Regions:
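Ampipathic, surface-exposed secondary-structure segments
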Residues: 142-143, 147, 168-174
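A conserved beta-strand-loop-helix scaffold within acyl/acetyltransferase catalytic domains
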Residues: 2-160
């Protein structure tokens, strides 16, 4: 990696074989927390809500209601209908969210273009939040046959409950 001038290299969710290979080759394994949601045969979002106590259900419904009352809707784009413009829009949201926290985004437009043009096998899905016919936020996920991996998100505005709706609830409904 030094020959390539690479400072760090991160692999998210390696399968068991790759994880073992990395350990055997002295890569450092990082342990952290992650949220994994499992669909336990829920037919819809309401079924999912029924696992919670009444107060928790009410809180989630109130969060979703806030977004709905702001007239924010959602558009789901996958590899079949993602365009270069969609990737450009997502990058603007992603970059803005980092810059608001005085940080530099660690992924650049080249990465997103590469995913779009060369890595259809990752099966990207972007959940776009729409307000007044304009995209205002997005959450990027990758999918396998039975798993939706979410990690990247961004928004133009700091709107209460928008992060959870875009990153979690939309993915659960999907």
């Amino acid at each position: 990696m030094q020959d390539e001038n690479i400072e760090t290299w991160h692999i998210l969710f390696p399968d068991n074989e790759l994880a073992e290979f990395l350990r055997e080759n002295n890569f450092v394994e990082r342990y952290g927390y992650k949220f994994i949601w499992r669909n336990k045969s829920y037919d819809n979002f309401e079924d999912y809500l029924n696992i919670f106590k009444s107060r928790q259900r009410k809180n989630i419904k109130n969060e979703r209601k806030k977004i709905s009352e702001l007239d924010i809707s959602f558009e789901i784009k996958d590899m079949k209908n993602l365009t270069n413009k969609d990737w450009d829009d997502f990058y603007i949201f992603y970059k803005n969210t980092y810059e608001e926290r005085l940080q530099r985004p660690y992924l650049n437009t080249k990465f997103f273009k590469y995913v779009h043009e060369c890595r259809a096998d990752l099966r990207p899905v972007i959940f776009f939040a729409i307000h007044k016919n304009k995209k205002i936020a997005g959450s990027l996920c990758f999918q396998s046959n039975d798993t939706l991996y979410g990690r990247h998100w961004g928004s133009l505005y700091n709107i209460d409950s928008l992060h959870f709706e875009t990153c979690y609830y939309q993915g659960i409904e999907y």
